[in-house]
Amino acid sequence: MRSETDVVVIGAGMGGLAAAIGAAAAGLRVTVVEAGDAPGGKARAVPTPGGPADTGPTVLTMRHVLDALFAACGTRAEEHLTLIPLPRLARHFWPDGSSLDLFTDTEANIEAIRAFAGDKEAAAFRRFDHLTTGLWEAFHRSVIAAPKPDLWRIAAATVTRPQLWPALRPGLTMRDLLAHHFKDPRLAQLFGRYATYVGGRPGATPAVLSLIWQAEVQGVWAIREGMHGVAAALARVAEAKGVRFHYGAKAKRIVRKEGRVTAVEIETGVSIPCGACIFNGDPGALRDGLLGDAARASMEKSPRPAPSLSAWVWAFGATPIGVDLAHHNVFFTADPELEFGPIGAGEMPEEPTLYICAQDREMQAPVPEIERFEIIMNGPAGHQPFPQEEAQCRARTFPMLAAMGLTFSPDPETRALTTPALLSRRFPGSLGAIYGGSPEGTLATFRRPLARTGLKGLYLAGGGTHPGAGVPMALTSGTHAARALLADRISAAK
């Protein structure tokens, strides 16, 4: 392994890749150690008869974040990936046989909702869209893009916008806000679904996070190479900038000497001297002492949050039979409480809502006979398997889809299923949560760990770190970590 290294990045997830690129672009010598056999972290794929199927994130928004990383390496995303803009955000289905497509175009959405639920609900959507636009404008620069949530900037951005104040009331949830806007429960259910995009339940997630709608409506892209292909492309351009990657290299300990990071030890016994370390993993791994006492002590002032949602994920190849699928699809339960009630109690949902990514649809290419699918059923975090887990999950997934007109041939095999317990083992310290800490609670956004820790030279990146979950957020966290590291080096040199 590299003996002359300025920075060791632990983990080649999206946050780690962005951090490595940011540090290397500034001229630092960077080594990435990754326990797995490929980059991507949660953005991974499994082999199927139809080709590699994503079994992690599938939605790419805020594309400017990705573009900036390729630009830092002197290239363009289009030279490495086939990025396809999707005019249709998703196709939504309900048990009563109704369905609704939503788009990136506001007027198209208004007309679709008018045909779906009538003039009053179309007008309600226009008001909701206007409100969330204002929330996005107020919170994007002051929270999402900022290295630390800036209360003064939030106040300055909202004090002159009284129309936003009701959505900022402490204790008001997304479910409350949406019930005020929409009389049709299907629309309240649909837009409440965005709470799950950051790992929360709509009945407990702050109303302000309704702004997530704007992250999608501003643009969604499909990637022909898959989300795992995005990670592979970022790793390639990072290597071209001089970053060295070591796969199958599990970090064992972050070494402290004289109050700062001096090395990272690998389980094989190799020690990599360095001046700084960026940890791209769940912060819970540090709190649990999995990287040594020095790393654990660095998190003493950062209390462990409640975990976000986990999921049961099917990834497989098959031929679909029945309803016409888009790239992104949501099959809703008739009663959201039969989903979120059990999840809140730590149980598998009785009647889940199911997200399906039909990875070969809307890709500007013929749809193959064997298509690739990812099906996500939200669930509670936890490291222990559920009783009869595979059978229970199968029974609550495919009969529901069949009742709504969708079947697959052949049925997915057991090995196609990823469980919360498996996610917990794969991502130490996470308890199987796939969105970091829970977004539920008024102050959850302000309690996420920031890039700097209590140990000089140790920084954090990833979905468990500010600004939170999702591919663009994880990438942003990596950029924050690299910038914090560089700023500290400049300060120390003065």
Swiss-Prot record:
Pathway: Carotenoid biosynthesis; spheroidene biosynthesis. Keywords: Carotenoid biosynthesis, Chlorophyll biosynthesis, Oxidoreductase, Photosynthesis. InterPro entries: Amino_oxidase, carotdesatCrtD, Carotenoid/retinoid_OxRdtase, FAD/NAD-bd_sf, Phytoene_DH_bac_CS. It catalyses: rhodopin + A = (3E)-3,4-didehydrorhodopin + AH2. GO terms for molecular function: oxidoreductase activity, acting on the CH-CH group of donors. The keyword Secreted does not apply. It is an enzyme of class 1 (oxidoreductase). One of its GO terms (biological process) is chlorophyll biosynthetic process. Its EC number is 1.3.99.27. It comes from the Bacteria. PANTHER family: 4,4'-DIAPONEUROSPORENE OXYGENASE (PTHR43734:SF7), PHYTOENE DESATURASE (PTHR43734). Belongs to the carotenoid/retinoid oxidoreductase family. This is Hydroxyneurosporene desaturase. It comes from Rhodobacter capsulatus (strain ATCC BAA-309 / NBRC 16581 / SB1003). The gene is crtD.
